[in-house]
Amino acid sequence: MITVALAKGALLRESVERFQAAGLDFSAVLDPDNRQLMVPSTCGRARALLVRNGDVPVYVAYGQAQLGIVGYDVLREHQMPVAHLVDLGFGGCRMSVAVKNTSGYTRATDLPPHCRVASKFTRCARQYFDSIDLPVELVHLTGSVELGPITGIAEAIVDLVATGRTLRDNGLVAIEDLFHTTARLVGHPLALRLDQGELQSIIDVMQRSPHDAVGVN
């Protein structure tokens, strides 16, 4: 039986639609009354694990799921040994450095050395600031990172930015982009090597335009 890891949250609906196009229907996870974390497909030949975003590559890396869909930002941050298979193109946003709009900073190199930077993505932030040779103190937060500059716990933040509305509503502005992120299909390397074609048929469908995809049998 094929097991796939699906992330709760913003990527879930489109992830379910992509697997539906490949012949695996996990639409039951979209039911607001659903409380199951392991959901079988309607065809009975696969199941989905409904997990937190950051846990998708963990389940795939340890072989509890053969496939998963997760944001590139999570893959960059966690760096788990999974196979990067397809850039699915949805869920696009930017990993950015942001500051108070009254700070006067216009680029990351304007920040003072050894200032505090708040982020949920401390590995990505560290790699970026190391690349521009700017020493900073990273403050790990798990939510509402925008409060960092507002409360004074940090001079800047590194976080995902889609429309920028949340930043604007909190008096912040993005001054530098680290990278662009989209949803990616990932796989367990050994499972892919041992695959008898079933996983590859799903991957092949995922590689097509979602408008052209036809479910596999």
Swiss-Prot record:
What pathway does this protein act in? Amino-acid biosynthesis; L-histidine biosynthesis; L-histidine from 5-phospho-alpha-D-ribose 1-diphosphate: step 1/9
Q: Name one Pfam family in it.
A: HisG
* GO CC annotation: cytoplasm
Entry's family note: Belongs to the ATP phosphoribosyltransferase family. Short subfamily.
HAMAP family tied to this protein: HisG_Short
- Outline the subunit composition: Heteromultimer composed of HisG and HisZ subunits.
**What is the name listed in the Swiss-Prot or TrEMBL entry for this protein?**
ATP phosphoribosyltransferase
Q: Which organism is it from?
A: Synechococcus sp. (strain WH7803)
Gene designation per UniProt: hisG
